Amino acid sequence: ASDVYKRQGYNYSSTSYPKMDRFYGELEGYVPTKGGIANIDLKRTAFGLKFIVTPPIDGTLSIGSYSLNPNIKVSADDSTLETSFMCTFQQIYECWQAENYTQDFTIILTWNRVNGATQTFEKIITAKRNVMTTINVNVNGSSTDSSLGVKEEDTPMGSENVDMNFNGGDLDDNEVNPSM
C-alpha cells in the first residue's frame, strides 16, 4: 500500500505513473557469432491520455486522478483546453507479455462554483497499451448536466522497430604490459 499525499488540492498516490514513453523487449537463446546481429523486438509499454476540456459556465474546473496527476484547471473565461500525455504502465513485464494489456484509473472532476459550492464527479476509465484514449470533459449548469465522455482513438500509435547492433569484438585475451 502506498501513502496518499495532498498536493495542490488533489489526492494522489506516491506510486504515480511516469509521464514518458517506454519500450521493452527481451532476447533469449542468442549465441554470439562473428558477424551475427542481435535483434530485439520491442513493444510499447505505455498508454496515452488526451483531455479535451470545455470550460465550465462559471467557476473553475479541476481534473485530477489518484495516480495519474494530470493537474488540469480550466476557468469559465478560458478557451477549450486540449492536452495530451503518455504514461508508462508500472507492470512493465506483464504489459509486455499481454497484447491487450489494460488498467483502470479514476478521473476526478472538481467544480468550484462562483456561488461557493463545490461539486465532485468521478469516472473510471480504462487505459490500454499502445492506445491514446481521448477524454471529453463538459460540465454545465446543474449537477445533472455534467458529462465525462471517453473515446478511444481509432488510429493506433503505430509501431517502431529498433535495431540494436553490438560489436563485442573478438574474445582473444589482450596482453597488457604496464610501463613504469
List the predicted regions and their residue ranges.
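Tryptophan-paired
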Residues: 2-7, 60-132, 174-180
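Repeat-unit-sized solenoid/scaffold elements
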Residues: 54-70, 137-150
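A short, Gly/Thr-enriched small/hydrophobic beta-strand-prone motif that recurs across taxa
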Residues: 42-57
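Short, low-hydrophobicity acidic/polar segments
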Residues: 2-46
